[in-house]
A protein has these predicted regions:
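Active-site-adjacent segment of FAD-dependent monooxygenases/related oxidoreductases
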Residues: 12-15, 20-90, 181, 190, ...
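A conserved beta-strand/loop element that lines the FAD pocket in flavoprotein oxidoreductases
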Residues: 90-104
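Glycine-rich phosphate/pyrophosphate-binding beta-alpha loops
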Residues: 186, 240-243, 262-273, 308
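C-terminal helical "tail/cap" subdomain of flavin- and related membrane-associated enzymes
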Residues: 247, 285-345
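Glycine-rich FAD pyrophosphate-binding loop
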Residues: 1-16
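Conserved FAD-binding catalytic core of PHBH/FMO-like flavoproteins
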Residues: 86-87, 110-114, 124, 130, ...
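Short loop/edge segments at beta-strand edges and connector loops
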Residues: 99-101, 117, 235-237
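FAD-binding beta-loop-beta segment adjacent to the flavin cofactor pocket
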Residues: 239-256, 260-262, 311
């Protein structure tokens, strides 16, 4: 296995921060989960709140303890996962990561793929049996094969702000993962090991400079979690949000996984988890082909299994999550709140 990484090293950006129970079960088989738990925050409960009414409902993951070895969410930043995996790869003589190696193009025949990539010393070529594009939402691999990325872009931007203040000490009974509904100023609030992260929407027309002004951010945070002092803003990010799925996850010997294959809004924490599930599913198929004489038709099965899940579950659920948080109709909003209360009673 050879990994081409365009950057000079693993990037330190926080990115995703939630590992769900099925993902932890999968990673446990690879010896990864214990290393993540050491660096993460176990979060057994999930809250739904309203900006004006407060706590609506609280879900306890312990109810699924008979179905998983990890009945909780683990809050642990994505960059920690990449470092754990890098360390594990060093134990394998047949695996390597080539840093500062930027994918350029790929062509394929019936029995191989030829990849061109650039380094500081120039253009290089490498041959392989299969190419798996896991290079993000702007995937150069996907684009090189003219695979459509169907879906839509939301007409707003998302801001994330990280602060060290203990929000559960500022707001009574605030959960470590809380989705706070409001027609225009909804928020997702997540407690990671070293900070609390606020995520909220802003108008598409607002510039980065305006969105990052201390006065604007402080005002938004104070509305969500009123605090007698000023919040200490450690990190702020701004990004556009898409809901898209690749037209196909397989084109001959070239396959897609993770954000290269599907992207969605972050409400529910399904992006990274879905990508890990892709990787586990696809690796099982490749192991069957290499070690057990399996047919390459298994790669079509990967597409048939994972792509419908992205469309019918992940896309549908994340779209619904956002709609529920920003619902403007008071009657629908009340009905949703009553449903949540009834489920947890």
């Amino acid at each position: 296995v050879c990994v081409l990484e365009a950057e000079a090293d693993l990037i330190p950006e926080l990115r995703a921060s939630t590992f769900h129970p099925p993902t932890l079960d999968m990673l446990d088989k690879l010896g990864i989960t214990p290393k993540l738990i050491e660096q993460g925050l176990i979060t057994p409960k999930l809250q739904y709140r309203d900006l004006e009414e407060g706590l609506i409902a609280e879900f306890d993951h312990s109810i699924i303890r008979d179905h998983t070895d990890h009945p909780y969410r683990l809050q642990c930043e994505q960059f920690k996962l990449t470092r754990v995996v890098e360390d594990l790869l060093e134990e394998y003589s047949n695996a390597e990561i080539l840093y500062s190696s930027k994918f350029v193009s790929a062509s394929q025949t019936d029995d191989k793929v030829v990849i061109s990539y650039d380094t500081s010393t120039g253009r290089n070529n490498i041959e392989c049996d299969y190419l798996i594009g896991t290079d993000g939402s702007r995937s150069a691999v996907r684009k090189s094969q003219d695979i459509e990325f169907k879906g839509f872009t939301y007409p707003e931007q998302f801001v994330t702000v990280s602060v060290p203040e203990e929000i559960d000490s500022i707001v009574t009974n605030m959960g470590h993962v809380s989705y706070i509904s409001h027609p225009t100023e909804w928020c997702a609030l997540i407690h990671a090991p070293d900070y609390w992260r606020f995520l909220f929407p802003i108008e598409m027309e607002m510039s980065k400079e305006e969105a990052f002004k201390d006065e604007f951010i402080q005002k938004r945070l104070q509305k969500i979690a009123p605090y007698k002092g000023k919040y200490t803003i450690q990190l702020r990010t701004l990004y556009g949000v898409n809901q898209r799925v690749a037209e196909s996850y397989r084109l001959g010997r070239i396959l897609l996984a993770g954000d290269s294959a599907h992207v969605n809004n972050p409400l529910g924490g399904m992006g990274m988890n879905g990508g890990i599930h892709d990787g586990v599913n696809l690796s099982e198929k490749l192991i069957a082909i290499y070690n057990n004489g399996g047919s390459e038709d298994l790669l079509d099965l990967y597409d048939r299994q994972r792509r419908p899940i992205a469309i019918e579950y992940v896309q549908a659920q994340t779209i619904r999550n956002k709609k529920n948080l920003e619902e403007r109709d008071p009657n629908i909003r009340k009905q949703r709140q009553d449903e949540l209360r009834a489920i947890t009673d």
